[in-house]
């Protein structure tokens, strides 16, 4: 069994003296692991950094085996991201989230969106909003998507400014006003309702919304906490915003 495909490096773990087990996110083969011989060596170590794009060839005797990867660098994203603490925290947050995906199950839209966030990480005013939307996409891909198209109480499609923590559904301004202290804010950029540039508060409201549902549906049931890198990201954004 063998295949070749581009993939995003999610991380590695040491295997013996010189080898590593590489974890990739690929478009057609999903989250996939494989042994890289010499992965701790001088040539490959810089290549196998989280966020880099590699051309990977996987080979195994049987499809269910761990198998081996041979890799070549395509995009060395880690070098341009690691010098900025906020971008680095954002990258590590995405990589940690991606490890929640079932192995070897393709998620094309989520992979494509991951690449878009990576490509935009030098654009300070864009990438945090894209990361919020990527987290929403992760929830949707794993069966916990939010219903943000109409008001849960009235069916209205206008003035949707809240989200119910119980149902994950949007709530309009009028219907939510008596309960607004118990509802999450729904920033306009999340649903594309406004062309205005999101404020710092909008971005924090977006991360607060996604963080609640990530913990509720994905992290909490697994008995694990949201990534430390995500908390660090919010701290960094507050310092710069």
Feature roles, as predicted:
Residues 1-21, 25-241:
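Non-catalytic alpha-helical scaffolds and adjoining flexible linkers that form interface surfaces
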